[in-house]
Amino acid sequence: MHSYLLSIDQGTTSSRAILFDRQGRVAGVAQEEFAQHFPASGWVEHDAEDIWQSVLRTCRQVMESTGASIEEIAGIGMTNQRETTLLWDRRTGEPLHRAIVWQDRRTGAYCQSLIDAGHEAFIQSRTGLLIDPYFSATKLRWLLENVPGARERAERGELAFGTVDTFLLWRLTGGREHATDATNASRTCLFNIHTQQWDEALLSLFEIPASLLPEVKDSSADFGRAEPHWLGGPLPIAGIAGDQQAALVGQTCFAPGMAKSTYGTGCFMIINTGEKAEVSHNRLLTTVAYRLNGKTTYAMEGSIFVAGATVQWLRDGLKLFADASETEALARQTRAGHGVYLVPAFTGLGAPHWDPGARGAIFGLTRDTGIAEIVAAGLQAVCYQTRDLQACMDDDIEASAGRLRVDGGMVSNNWVMQFLADMLGVPVDRPTVLETTALGAAYLAGLQLGWYADLDEIAGLWRCERTFEPSMEEAERERLYRGWLDAIERVKCSAETRGRA
């Protein structure tokens, strides 16, 4: 009798393996961090072998620590850091270069040349995305142009491209499966989200040979079986989704207007828009939420590059505290209107500003400012940025979110969650199970494997641990937010992005 689903959650700084039971409860967790490589300013890389080995080890560790046998596991769901780009040899499976991570900004000049040439409207109309180094297409083009012999080998059909899910699937299946799902494909800037196919015009624009590309499947599908020697048996791989879409599924945001926000290294707010690919007038992204039985559900997304990374910087860079758990007590020492604003534009600004040249700053310092105020300002920045996204979504979509479901490491901080509810002016729901990204991948696998009849059954499993109700006066909320907007304007790099909301 199958008791568990194994979820592989391959993230930006660590790989995790989690076993879930049929009720969506966590039975066991294993996690392993891996090295980050910064070979030049603005460049971020991962060693693909580090990713692969960390995934294998965590899967084996969680089975060992829980005592789960291979016979008790129904199958595998997989979720991954999106956009991160790999290129490997089809014969050997060996990568030609380190993975270029979603945070990497090396293709900024090329992206600007595409914008200057007037391509952004065309690209957005096909992909729902903007021209930015964030997405996979320009990273893949860089690999083809800069790895010796790569373009020639690609033209001969010797190489394979994939995001992290595709690379792991290739490895797990012994090279038998070169595939991805529609959510990951929708983040490459090469996939037409309306036709649900790789787009020939985009491939031509970015100079990408079609022979490199994986097959695109539903998010719940037959992705093959793992080679028995990896985990002890030929487990079926039955669900794949990019991390933020997987979290949307894990939070059971299945109706149009339902929204979730994940607070990890970055912050990602996604609202379900149903069968309609809503176009943002505020520079948010239109993306695939999930594709099931050939039917596509769309979402609108705002991506904030720095959320939990601010806490890491305050801890490791400024050494203001020893452990992230100390931040709540520090923040509680401050008065509400302390006047300090921290804009964490360490790698530029994401949605809705999309200003890669912006840089971080702290405003409002006085002789009274201490560690507590700076820490509080860093935490509040995440909430202000979420308010930025909320304002855009409310303007773009009729069925806007009347409440927000949250997950990720930062949501365990009650002070942050209360300030978030106050700043948004809507209830904020924190679920009982915070491993929503991995849970979403497990649910997708469970649908394919017959564990769950439909999305309604999965929605019935969601449980709320605590709701944070807004309690701040409207006038105070708006006063604080105006201060944030002023700080944002001050860090923007170019006249073009100043005044853009």
UniProtKB/Swiss-Prot annotation:
Q: Which HAMAP family match?
A: Glycerol_kin
What keywords are assigned to this protein? ATP-binding, Glycerol metabolism, Kinase, Nucleotide-binding, Transferase
Stated name of the protein = Glycerol kinase
Q: Which EC class, in a word? A: transferase
Under catalytic activity, the entry for this protein gives:
glycerol + ATP = sn-glycerol 3-phosphate + ADP + H(+)
Q: Which InterPro entries match?
A: ATPase_NBD, Carb_kinase_FGGY, Carb_kinase_FGGY_CS, FGGY_C, FGGY_N, Glycerol_kin
Residues that hold glycerol according to the record: R82, E83, Y134, D243, Q244
Which annotated residues bind ATP?
T12, T13, S14, T265, G308, Q312, G409
Residues of the signal peptide: none
User: What EC number(s) does its UniProt record assign?
Assistant: 2.7.1.30
Q: Which domain of life is it from?
A: Bacteria
Report the protein's function: Key enzyme in the regulation of glycerol uptake and metabolism. Catalyzes the phosphorylation of glycerol to yield sn-glycerol 3-phosphate.
Name any one GO molecular function: ATP binding
**Which residues participate in ADP binding?**
T12, R16, T265, G308, G409, N413
Q: Which residues bind sn-glycerol 3-phosphate?
A: T12, R82, E83, Y134, D243
Q: Which GO terms describe its biological process?
A: glycerol catabolic process; glycerol metabolic process; glycerol-3-phosphate metabolic process
In which pathway does this enzyme or protein participate? Polyol metabolism; glycerol degradation via glycerol kinase pathway; sn-glycerol 3-phosphate from glycerol: step 1/1
- GO cellular component terms, A-Z: cytosol
